[in-house]
Design a protein with these regions (language model features):
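AlphaC helix of the protein kinase catalytic domain
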Residues: 116-127
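Activation segment signature within eukaryotic-like protein kinase domains
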Residues: 135-136
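Protein kinase catalytic-loop region centered on the HRD/HxD motif
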Residues: 141-151
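Structural helix C-cap motif within protein kinase domains
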Residues: 237-241
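Conserved C-terminal C-lobe helix
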Residues: 268-282
Length: 322
């Protein structure tokens, strides 16, 4: 059979021991494509397959996806996406896609049925304090575990937080972190990850803001704290503190601008929480930020019950240092 191009992936295509059922939309600047597939034989359990990009910089993309598998094999937490076997080889969790030109690497994951936090937030605007804190505490405890295991996620954002089960009104939400593609400490040929949620130290290490190497200096876990501060801000206010028309303008704001107080847009928030986010999470200097453990300790004080409000239309000595 003649190999096909990665861009020609479609339902019905064969990939390893799987038949593709659905091709998910390609993410902006992504290093891989993701499809939903069914095994050709054996158990009838579906898997999400992540396939490395080909073409320019493909050696980097191939290495990154293999590193992602290695990281996920070392993590065992309900808040981290679970691997699924794709081959009977030495490492059953990764395989070459010989059906595709250049035989890119791919690996399998559980299918997460509830969509992304980004999709859930559309149309909701801001969440209540108890709900926002519950979201961030659940994701934060997952990140605290990841940090203990010696890794930093480096791309925490609503698009990379999915829900394990299909969303039903009144049920509790179970967020799961996906996409560990930039968790590996590799030299980056381009700006991987979402700039809006990116910490300043990850932007400063390049002479050109549009092409940073993205190697976090000092304690890389502090970049995740920054992203959680941005996420909490978004959940409470309905928008991120640093926005712009281009990645370059967002980069400039992250590096130079002081984030506006959340209380300017929402007066019912506790002043100490506003100070915690602005000074404890979004400090420009990583060493001035709290640890993920401190973040979780503070956020847990505000956390409440978090249940689905609506099913999505498209299925597709600072005061906190105690």
């Amino acid at each position: 059979m003649q190999p096909y191009q990665l861009s020609d992936l479609k339902p019905g295509s064969l990939l390893g021991g799987f038949r593709i059922l659905e091709v998910y939309p390609e993410g902006r600047g992504g290093m891989a494509r993701v499809v939903r597939a069914r095994p050709l034989k054996g158990e009838d359990q579906q898997a999400a397959l992540k396939i490395s990009r080909t073409g320019g910089n493909q050696d980097y993309f191939f290495a990154a996806i293999q590193k992602e598998v290695e990281i996920l094999q070392k993590l065992d937490h309900r808040g981290v996406v679970r691997l699924k076997p794709v081959s009977e080889g030495k490492n059953p969790f990764k395989e070459r896609a010989v059906e595709i030109t250049d035989s890119p690497w791919f690996f399998g994951m559980e299918v997460l049925r509830g969509g992304s936090l980004e999709a859930y937030l559309r149309g909701l605007g801001a969440l209540s304090l108890a709900e926002a804190a519950a979201v961030c505490h659940q994701v934060g405890t997952t990140l605290e575990y990841i940090h203990r295991e010696g890794f930093a996620h480096n791309d925490v954002k609503p698009d990379n937080i999915l829900f394990r089960r299909e969303l039903k009104v009144g049920e509790r939400l179970e967020p799961v972190l996906i996409d560990f593609g930039v968790a590996a400490k590799l030299v980056r040929p381009q700006l991987d990850g979402s700039v809006v949620y990116m910490a300043p130290e990850r932007l400063q290490e390049s002479r050109e803001p549009s092409a940073p190497e993205l190697l976090a200096s000092g304690d890389p876990s502090k970049a995740d704290v920054w992203s959680m501060g941005i996420l909490l801000y978004r959940l409470l206010v309905g928008r991120e503190p640093f926005l712009g028309l281009t990645d370059r303008s967002v980069t400039s704001a992250i590096l130079r601008a002081i984030p506006p107080s959340m209380m300017k847009r929402r007066q019912d928030l506790p002043r100490e929480l506003d100070q915690f986010v602005i000074e404890g999470c979004l400090a420009k200097e990583p060493k001035l930020r709290v640890s993920m453990r401190e973040f979780n300790s503070v956020i847990d004080r505000y956390s409440g019950d978090w249940r689905v409000k609506r099913a999505p239309k498209n299925r597709r000595r600072l005061p906190w240092r105690r």
